[in-house]
Amino acid sequence: GLKNTVWEMDDMPSCYTVDRLVKLRMDGVKFMIRLNPMDERSKYTVRYCAEAVNAAESAGLPIFIEALYVETTETGFTMKTDSESLCKVVGVVGALGCRASGKWIEVPLNHEYAVPTAATTCPVLVVPDEVKSEPIEVVEEYTKEIGISSNIRGILLGRNVMYNESDPLPIAEAIADIWHKGGNAEENYKRCVEKL
């Protein structure tokens, strides 16, 4: 939604359609949904998203949905990442459309991550906290979710990896190595730096 507009929670699609993505031979569909149960306009966003899920399924495209729960405050809308809020939005996203096949849910990281990831049988991609910037701390932040839930299938690399003051390549490689092979954050990062 357009920030600070009266229709911000009525987050209508304004860019690519699934038909256009198919014509461009794209590999999938990606969007974000902000659910605000106390704002009636949110119901329109839920409908738009359900229609997009159905269109993607009909086209045979996987769909990746970032699930965000927001509440209305005096200063606008604030994202909530407590487990109860995340379970609600993950449950809604999991139920969007006619089928769950091909649907991946991107879930913001919190301190009880096993709880919201258990709210769906869909594959989950971790959306980590991007506060840390020191390379080893970033690797630790991006790998602490491993093994929490069997439906966690990967992680989204954010700004603190892509635009880190240090070289982002060994950070990303260390994260991938730990996700696929296990190991220690510091040792993996140092090994990846030495490979350069």
What are the functions of these language-model segments?
Residues G154-M162:
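Short acidic/histidine-rich active-site segments
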Residues I148, M162-L196:
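C-terminal helical cap(s) of enzyme catalytic domains, especially alpha/beta-barrels
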Residues L2-T5, D10-C122, K132-R153, D177, ...:
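Alpha/beta enzyme core
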Residues V127-E130, R159-N160:
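Short, loop-centered acidic/histidine patches that primarily coordinate divalent metals
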